[in-house]
Amino acid sequence: MTFFVGLTRDLLTPGGEPSFGKTPLELLSQPGLDLKWEFIPESVTEITPDLMARYDGIYVNTPRVTAASVAGPHLRTKIIARHGVGYDSVDVKALADKGVITTNTPVAIQRPVSVAALTFILALAGRLVIKDQLTRENRWNERTNHMGLGLTTRTLGVVGIGGIGKELLKLARPFGWRMLAADPFVDESVIRELGGERVSLEDLMRQSDFVVTTVLLNEKTRHLINAERLALMKRTAYLINMARGPIVDELALIDALRAGTIAGAGLDVFEQEPIAADNPLLNMDNVLLAPHSLCWTDECFDHMAREGLGCIVDFAQGKTPKSIVKPG
């Protein structure tokens, strides 16, 4: 029986083209592969039981996949492949209980997210936004009021040493700064080999000039960066959130920024997405913001689609996909 795959429509550009380009789709049309595919005709925010009854595999970007998604009487789907590394939008256990596996793209995202974190750091350290304004507004003589920060005498703190955290330490090492890492689940020798020092989260918050979060969102990491931990940071330090919005208590962060408890922040993610029009962060000139897409590049999406669609192809051929998310 032909394996039928649906791709969520939010993976299309406004012009109707695949956002990741056409080349990865060639994986679904290999000679000898009994598979057909389509972009799902409906635009949905949650995968419905009807869709789970229609397709053998679904490639998902932002729509949620919940227990309700697999509650229908005619469940056909056997694999949900996430276009991305995070899977907080997927009820992995509920799917597994129904015999549906979940995959993600942990390898493809490592370099792009790490580069995006460094983009925030370099822009904040170099005072890029205000210097752009000075130039455009003919305020040239004010430039000595906005001295940037050199990095060789600073400390980078990385919270979470998974694939992205490791890649970030690797890319950041040539700057010659001190690098701290907080992750109780990673062997200290791994961190040392990357040039970092393993410390507690509290010590990392106290000592770092730039704190970068790269952890997955779950009940244990929700509001991991709270008011108490923000209060530990240097007044000259910056927080960079590249993970998920709820990793940081956003109200506590706003309070810390207003009070001058920390110097600023770079945020690619928010507790509410899209960000509300009245969110105070939008009016803060010491905060850089991106719409959960700073790592999005042509290479990033191409590699993600290859990895994610590759999982579906492997499954359709009776092979075990490389990046199955374990429930629980």
Segments (PLM) and residue ranges:
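Rossmann-like adenosine-cofactor binding region
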Residues: V65-V70, F185-P280
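Phosphate-binding beta-alpha-beta segment of Rossmann-like dinucleotide-binding domains, i.e.
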Residues: K98, P106-T155, K170-P174, I324
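Short beta->alpha connector loops at strand-helix junctions that form conserved
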Residues: H83-G84, V100-R111, D183, L201-E202, ...
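N-terminal glycine-/charge-rich "phosphate-binding" loop or analogous flexible N-terminal tail
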Residues: M1-Y55, A316
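Rossmann-like dinucleotide-binding domain for NAD(H)/NADP(H)
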Residues: T102, T236-G328
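Glycine-rich Rossmann-fold phosphate-binding loop(s) that bind the pyrophosphate
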Residues: I161-G162
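N-terminal Rossmann-fold NAD(P) dinucleotide-binding loop
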Residues: G165-K166
